[in-house]
UniProtKB/Swiss-Prot annotation:
HAMAP family registered for this protein in UniProt: PSI_PsaJ
Main localization of the protein described in the UniProt heading: plastid
Function statement: May help in the organization of the PsaE and PsaF subunits.
Record field: transmembrane: 7-27
Protein name as annotated: Photosystem I reaction center subunit IX
Taxonomic source organism: Thalassiosira pseudonana
Length: 41
């Protein structure tokens, strides 16, 4: 169990989880508020 916890705390695993969360968040924001990635002045 200690090795599994050490594996989950490594950088590639944390980076993958963070990028998955970020991509999902951006997708959901764009679903409810489309075309907000471009800034229109």
């Amino acid at each position: 169990m200690n090795d599994f916890q050490k594996y989950l705390s490594t950088a590639p695993v944390l980076l993958t989880l963070w990028m998955t969360f970020t991509a999902g968040f951006i997708i959901e924001v764009n679903r409810f508020f489309p075309d907000m990635l471009g800034l229109y002045f």
